[in-house]
Structure formats: structure tokens, C-alpha cells
Amino acid sequence: MKTDESAQVVPDPYPALPIERGPHGRGVGRWVVQEKHRYLARYLDATREAQKKFKQRVLIDPFCGPGRIQVEGESFTRDGGSVAAYRQSVESGAPFTKLLVGDIEGKRVHANELRLKAAGATVQSFVGPAEETVSAMTKAVPFGALALAYIDPYNLEFLSFSIIERLARLQYVDFAVHFSLMDLTRNIDMELDPKRDRFDHALPGWRLAAPTNELSKSSLPAWFFDTWCKAVQALGFKISGQMPLITDGKGRSIYRLVFFSRHPLPDRIWNDIARSANLDLFASY
């Protein structure tokens, strides 16, 4: 099985360059390919006809990594998110005309850029924290282009709300955001301490607004997520009720994949492809 699967994977044109192998170096979870990349690929394919109506189609990935991953337990490597997205866009007949990729580590950005160019993409790269590079990324989007912002930070600490606010200024932009439930659930009670600030950029002012006298600690993560969603809606976006729950294969929730847009068509398409065993969160609000 592994042999057959590896034969279908496009070889790495730069095997000597950095490869993402997860925080412990043993490989990323299989859910990265089976869930995160699969949903992105299905969305790009399902929206191909709508995308063709735009002369310029841009992917924005401010947490791009090196563009190549190794899944735990596999001997071979695979495309990272931005490279996989570009290949899917080509296969679907509506290739991205420009990819804007960024990472805090220059070597990882350079590796991603080279791998994308090897696949035939037009790329512009940015080095630095996403909350700093996103302004330049926004300016690099051609006027009137359709943009897809793929926001995939390692944890909630780096999901600065200012990233979303700045990208929201674009005329045509849809978002696919990985919201770290694991980080939120594990640490929100500690973050109530005003001396700590890990979540302050993700949802400014949350600590003062949190109804700690009314909610149990176990209810705080749901309140935080709901309040974050309302902040996104206040920017003029509709959040899809279908939010795939990404787990680690051991029953532990890692992310919610949150999609939001201003136009009803991409929202309807996302709902169709993401509808599964995942619960519609907004049914309970």
C-alpha cells in the first residue's frame, strides 16, 4: 500500500532543502494530508468554474513552511499545503496566477518558493512574522483579483486578528483558517492571568469581555471561539456553519477548519464539500 501511494506522489525537486517533519521531527500527522489538504483540494476543484471568471487568481499563505512534508510512518515526502494547492488549481483548469507565501524563517520561505517555481507557479515570497508581512502581501494582490487566504498557524498564539483585518480590505477574498482548538482548550484558563498574553492578539480584549462569573472553565473555549467568529462576522463575512473538526487520529481535537466569505456562492460550495460527520456548530447558538 505504501509503495503504491508513494508512486503517485510527485518527487521533490529539491530534496536537500528543508522538509517539515513536525515539532518532534518524527513526521507530521496523517491528518495533514487526509484532512487539511483534502478539504483545500476539494474546494479548489469545486470552485474552478467560478474562479475562471477572474483574470487573476491569488493564493495567500503567510504560514507557508518549506513546501514539503513527511508524514509520520512514511519513508517518502509529499507536497506541502501551498504546493499541493497550486497543483490542484492546475489540475482543475483554473491555476493560481500568483502565489504569495511567507514564513518567519527565511530558509523555509526560500524552499517553498523554489518548489512552487519548479511546479510552474509565479511566486512572491515574504520573510517575517505573518502579522508583519501580511500588509505587504495585501499590497501585492493585483486589483480585482480573486484571493484565497489560507491561514494555517502552528497554534492560536500566532493567529493574530490583525492578519484577518488587513486581508479583509481586499475586494475579493475568501478565507480558510485553521483555528487551534487544542491550544485554546489546554491553555485558556491559564491565559486568564493578565500577566499572560498568548491569546491577546487572536482576540483583542477577550479577557475583559469573558463572563468568567457566569461560565465554567470548561465552557470558556466555546465562548472564546464563538466570540472570535462574531468578530469575523463584524468585518462583513459569513462564516460557514460547516467547520470540519481535525483530530489527531487518537480522538483529540486539534483544529477547526473555518471558512468564511462575503459572497454566497463560495459559502454554498464549501458547505457542500465539508458536510460530513462534523457537527454544524451554529446549530447550538
Where do the model's predicted regions map?
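Glycine-rich phosphate-binding loop signature in dinucleotide/nucleotide-binding domains
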Residues: 53-54, 140-145
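Short amphipathic alpha-helix with an adjacent loop that forms part of the alpha/beta core around
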Residues: 133-142, 165
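A conserved mid-domain beta-alpha-beta active-site/ligand-binding segment of alpha/beta enzyme cores
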Residues: 188-249
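A short, conserved alpha-helix within the catalytic core of class I
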Residues: 156-170
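Class I SAM-dependent methyltransferase Rossmann-like catalytic core
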Residues: 2-57, 74
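SAM cofactor-binding core of SAM-dependent methyltransferases
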Residues: 35-136
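Conserved beta-strand signature within the Rossmann-like core of class I S-adenosyl-L-methionine
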Residues: 171-186
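Flexible, glycine-/basic-rich loop-and-beta segments that form/coincide
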Residues: 264-285
